[in-house]
A protein has these predicted regions:
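C-terminal structural segments of small proteins and small subunits
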Residues: 64-94
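Flexible extramembrane loops and terminal tails that flank transmembrane helices
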Residues: 4-5, 96-97
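Cys/His-rich metal-chelating microdomains
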Residues: 18-21, 54
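Short Cys/His-centered divalent metal-binding micro-motifs
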Residues: 50-63
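Short metal-coordination and nucleic-acid-contact micro-motifs, chiefly zinc-binding Cys/His arrays
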Residues: 8-11, 44-47
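Short recognition patches in nucleic-acid-associated and regulatory proteins
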Residues: 20-37
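Short cysteine/histidine-rich zinc-coordinating motifs and their immediately flanking basic loops
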Residues: 24-29, 60-68
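Short cysteine-rich clusters marking metal-coordination/redox-active sites
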Residues: 12-15, 51
Length: 98
């Protein structure tokens, strides 16, 4: 009898929903204090997750969610980069490319 693989679950910092890790995007703060999008989910550092959803990315910018999650000032340009990245990923998913 085949053994079922465990599906890792993570909590979105924006909505608080607990979702399958594959449907989330990881944002990481490295030891150097740099904030980056982590598409592979394997970068070293403190991670926070949001849903791959345009609305969540906009709420994250509006409420400056990552300023609280990482206890530092995250530049506005990072939030803009995040919104465009999420929009790109959502469109690819809708086209069936991912």
């Amino acid at each position: 009898m085949p053994k079922n693989k465990k599906v890792p679950l993570r909590k979105s910092v924006v909505s608080g929903d607990i979702i399958d890790k594959r449907n989330l995007l990881r944002i990481v703060k490295t030891k150097d204090g740099e904030i980056a999008i982590d598409p592979t989910g394997k970068k070293n550092g403190r991670g926070a997750y949001i849903k791959l959803d345009n609305q969540e990315a906009l709420i994250a910018k509006k409420k400056k969610i990552f300023n609280h999650s990482f206890s530092m000032d995250v530049p506005e340009s990072f939030y803009d980069e995040l919104i465009s990245y999420v929009d790109h990923k959502v469109k690819r998913r809708e086209l069936g490319l991912e």
